[in-house]
């Protein structure tokens, strides 16, 4: 069912062939496309399940307190493979926030304010080069000029919300800490679900309640969709951020009983299990785990 759901679906996102970490004047680090990076339009749904597994495994590095250099490398590899998360359009109540006088924000991990002036909000994602944009009230004018590639990219997404189109431009950047936090949140959600069922019999009802509460906080604004008549009827998901797309794919995978998401007992890597009690991501990990186990048993016996 899971496989079929995404095989009959399409969506699109933009990734560049090169991203870099840059530090802004305020000392904050941002991920942004490189100066001469080339954009590529692709279908994230064709990347299931790897896009979700990769996102979760980046988060697991942080949950496992791995060295910062290892985490940073994994984050940059993910972004290069799949593109930025689209935080600018993921956080507000609507991705069409350019059509309103201000930006309205539901509760989130990154911005405390419930509403924000549009120019102030945009400055969070354009710390280096501004777009040629004029906004008066609900009216917005955006001039794209010079770079042919950027003009072509803008024309491709003319029917999309203006902010989504803007987030595909080279000038767009996302705060590194926010991106890292999002990966960590996804990994936390998975470990909460796995621990809840693993520890169910050994924890009391209060602890179970805390797990359920943590899980209930995971959710998102459902993406809209329409049907396109291609070579066969196809669901076209209108993801206005990659974040929302991953969140939806992750949700479906989390409840899939046929190929459950599991954590490897040996290396802590997230993998798709062929059955609900699968404990290892590979025969190699199973062997390693058993070798360590028998060694520690031997060591214990010798000490006695």
Which ranges hold each PLM region?
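BZIP DNA-binding basic region
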Residues: 246-304
């Amino acid at each position: 069912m899971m496989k079929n759901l995404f095989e009959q679906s399409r969506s699109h996102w933009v990734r560049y062939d090169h991203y870099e970490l840059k530090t802004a004047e305020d000392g904050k680090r941002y991920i942004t496309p490189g100066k001469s990076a080339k954009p590529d339009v692709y279908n994230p749904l064709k990347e299931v399940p790897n896009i979700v597994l990769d996102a979760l495994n980046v988060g697991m590095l942080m949950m496992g307190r791995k060295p910062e250099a290892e985490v940073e490398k994994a984050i940059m590899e993910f972004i290069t493979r799949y593109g930025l998360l689209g935080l600018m359009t993921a956080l507000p109540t609507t991705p069409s926030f350019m059509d309103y006088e201000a930006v309205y924000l539901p509760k989130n991990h990154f911005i405390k304010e419930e509403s924000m002036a549009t120019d102030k909000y945009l400055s969070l994602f354009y710390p280096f080069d501004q777009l040629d944009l004029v906004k008066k009230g609900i009216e917005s004018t955006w001039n794209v000029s010079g770079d042919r590639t950027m003009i072509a990219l803008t024309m491709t997404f003319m029917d999309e919300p203006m902010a989504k189109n803007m987030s595909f431009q080279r000038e767009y950047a996302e705060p590194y800490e926010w991106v890292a936090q999002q990966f960590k949140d996804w990994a936390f959600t998975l470990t909460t679900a796995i621990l809840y069922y693993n520890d169910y019999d050994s924890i009391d009802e209060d602890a179970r309640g805390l797990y359920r509460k943590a899980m209930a906080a995971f959710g998102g604004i459902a993406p809209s969709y329409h049907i396109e008549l291609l070579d066969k009827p196809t669901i076209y998901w209108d993801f206005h951020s990659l974040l929302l797309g991953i969140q939806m794919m992750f949700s479906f995978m989390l409840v899939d009983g046929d190929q459950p998401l599991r954590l490897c007992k040996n290396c802590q890597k997230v993998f798709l299990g062929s059955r609900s009690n699968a404990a290892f991501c590979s025969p190699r990990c199973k062997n390693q785990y058993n070798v360590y186990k028998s060694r520690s048993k031997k060591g214990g016996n010798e000490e006695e």
